[in-house]
């Protein structure tokens, strides 16, 4: 009978140890799941609050949705039309205090990359000119203008903002 008590005691100790291992395993799994959920929430919030045009020495650069990033500058290509330079400049200022893209080297590289050129008319109605494959130009301007003494088709004034 004495040997039976030792046997029962050993069984109880093994069951107690197994129960502790099970309890700790559940606790560890719960902590891992909790930290994964927490990191997922932080990542989602981070995407919502992503900086608009953020640049620093770490070479991290973000542009807002519908903007194009090129050479650490954000560009916005309008889809709506404006009447003149002043209207376009005001629309750019409404977009995160951005300024109207001007004739800077970076903009020239970008417009060259996108097959765009800039056309000046010496008045307030000038804008970006898109060169087609056959070198026929479609000036994006709201006034009538003959390019190289040829009659051209015109579209509404489009604009580019940069930040």
Swiss-Prot record:
Signal peptide: none annotated. It is found in: Host endoplasmic reticulum membrane. The chain crosses the membrane at residues 27-47. It is a single-pass type II membrane protein. The keyword Glycoprotein applies. Glycans are attached at residues 84, 96-97, 103, 109, 115, 129, 135. Keywords: Disulfide bond, Early protein, Glycoprotein, Host endoplasmic reticulum, Host membrane, Host-virus interaction, Lectin, Membrane, Modulation of host cell apoptosis by virus, Signal-anchor, Transmembrane, Transmembrane helix. SUPFAM superfamilies: C-type lectin-like. GO terms for molecular function: carbohydrate binding. One of its GO terms (biological process) is symbiont-mediated perturbation of host apoptosis. Residues 1-26 are cytoplasmic. Homodimer. Down-regulates MHC-I expression by impairing the appropriate configuration or presentation into the plasma membrane of the latter. Participates in viral hemadsorption, which may help viral spread. Reduces the transactivating activity of host TP53, thus inhibiting apoptosis. Non-essential for virus growth in swine macrophage cell cultures. This is Lectin-like protein EP153R.
